[in-house]
């Protein structure tokens, strides 16, 4: 009986380790593709792109609540041009024993495009901003089709810097609204660009 129980425990531990390794491998591949296909940072400069170690605890299943009555508004950017968004919904989840709520946005400019009409935008700052990560915040992209049964997976290991992190004065990068200023440290995703 003990042997059967031990073999079952060993089997489940092996499956869990494989799943975690497989997840980390998939994120490593995602990040490699991100670096290799970067539209702003090219060639030798790509060695200045850095990331936190992949950590599964920063992949969360968030509760999603759609905001049906949201109005379009101008989100400030790093430049002179403001971009128009509306709040698509509210995400709720826990990281490091802290309940977090974030607003998820939809871009008016992208809604007219067949390719990008389902894109959702999650800009944020956190306790690492300006220390380990870009001072003005980072972004995560989601799709409306990612939301299932009022839940959506938010993977901070995929958090990336806006183009303004690499080149100043050229791009109009949305500034994360204060509702998405997190007090916790999100040690996942892209770090500060080291060429500056």
Predicted regions and their residues:
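Start-of-domain marker
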Residues: 21-72
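Acidic, glycine-rich flexible loop segments
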Residues: 121-163
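Residues that act as N-cap/strand-start positions at coil-to-secondary-structure junctions
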Residues: 43-45, 54, 85-87, 134-136, ...
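Bacterial Sec-dependent N-terminal signal peptides
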Residues: 1-22
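Surface-exposed peri-terminal alpha-helical interaction modules
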Residues: 66-74, 82, 96, 142
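Mid-length scaffold segments of soluble, non-membrane domains
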Residues: 80-136
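Extended, aromatic/histidine-rich regions of cofactor-dependent oxidoreductases associated
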Residues: 21-24, 28, 160-196
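A structural detector for beta-sheet-dominated domains
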Residues: 52, 61-63, 94-96, 103-105, ...
């Amino acid at each position: 009986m003990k042997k059967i129980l031990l073999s079952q425990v060993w089997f489940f531990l092996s499956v869990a380790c494989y799943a975690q390794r497989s997840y980390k491998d998939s994120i490593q591949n995602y990040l490699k593709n991100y670096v290799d296909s970067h539209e702003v940072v090219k060639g030798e400069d790509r060695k200045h792109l850095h990331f936190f170690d992949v950590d599964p605890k920063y992949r969360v299943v968030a509760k999603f609540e759609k905001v049906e009555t949201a109005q379009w508004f101008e989100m400030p950017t790093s430049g002179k041009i403001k971009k128009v968004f509306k709040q698509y919904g509210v995400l709720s989840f826990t990281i490091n024993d802290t309940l977090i709520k974030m607003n998820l946005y939809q871009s008016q400019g992208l809604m007219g495009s067949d390719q990008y009409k389902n894109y959702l935008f999650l800009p944020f700052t956190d306790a690492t901003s300006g220390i380990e990560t870009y001072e003005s915040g980072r972004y995560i992209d989601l799709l409306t089709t990612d939301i299932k049964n009022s839940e959506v997976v938010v993977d901070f290991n995929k958090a990336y810097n806006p183009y303004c992190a690499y080149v100043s004065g050229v791009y109009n990068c949305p500034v994360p609204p204060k509702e998405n200023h997190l007090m916790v440290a999100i040690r996942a995703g892209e770090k500060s660009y080291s060429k500056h």
